[in-house]
A protein has these predicted regions:
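Short amphipathic alpha-helices in soluble, non-transmembrane regions
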Residues: 93-101, 143-150
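C-terminal motif of bacterial Sec signal peptides marking the signal peptidase cleavage site
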Residues: 11-15
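Bacterial N-terminal signal peptides that target proteins for export
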Residues: 1-3
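A short acidic-to-branched-hydrophobic micro-motif
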Residues: 76-87
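Short, compositionally biased low-complexity segments enriched in polar/charged residues
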Residues: 44-75, 118
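An anionic, turn-rich surface loop/hairpin at beta-sheet edges
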Residues: 97-122
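Bacterial signal peptide processing site
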Residues: 17-20
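A short, solvent-exposed beta-edge/loop patch
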Residues: 72, 82, 113-152
């Protein structure tokens, strides 16, 4: 069943777009904090500005707010990147996230990490742009929580 859900979720996210009028009163940090509180990432570490720019290709000038968390445990997938882009900067942020995804695929050492990275998609919801690399046991729940939080 989880495999079927993953296939269905992947097909939903192909094209990466939803209505451009989707928005939320929450910040990207607040959305990510709620996902982290739900324990969807084991031993999460928050990524700060310098590292976000250098390692995660994020131009801080393009964003209103962002949150990046990565697991400190290996092996195993555990990465969430949620960005609330400034108006007119969604495509730039999405392009940055595509670079992150390519890096994650290239850096994947364990088969489970590689599979998760290869099946991941970038989601765009209004000004929110997100990338989740989570194990299949929690991915659908985390994405549902994200969607519930980012839509009014």
């Amino acid at each position: 069943i989880s495999g079927l859900i993953l296939v269905m979720m992947s097909s939903v996210f192909v094209g990466c777009g939803k209505s451009s009028d989707v928005s939320s009163d929450l910040t990207a940090k607040e959305v990510a904090a709620k996902i982290i509180e739900a324990n969807y990432i084991v031993a999460p570490m928050e990524i700060e500005d310098d590292m976000a720019e250098e390692m995660y290709h994020l131009n801080i000038d393009d964003v209103e707010d962002y949150a990046i968390y990565e697991t400190q445990r290996s092996p195993g997938p555990g990465f969430i990147m949620i960005v609330k882009a400034k108006d007119g900067k969604v495509e730039d942020v999405k392009n940055s996230m595509e670079e992150v995804l390519a890096d994650k695929i290239g850096q994947a050492f364990y088969p489970a990490e590689q599979e998760v990275a290869e099946n991941a998609t970038i989601e765009v919801d209004g000004n929110f742009v997100s990338l989740f690399l989570l194990n299949s046991e929690v991915e659908a729940d985390a994405e549902k929580m994200y969607n519930d939080l980012t839509q009014k």
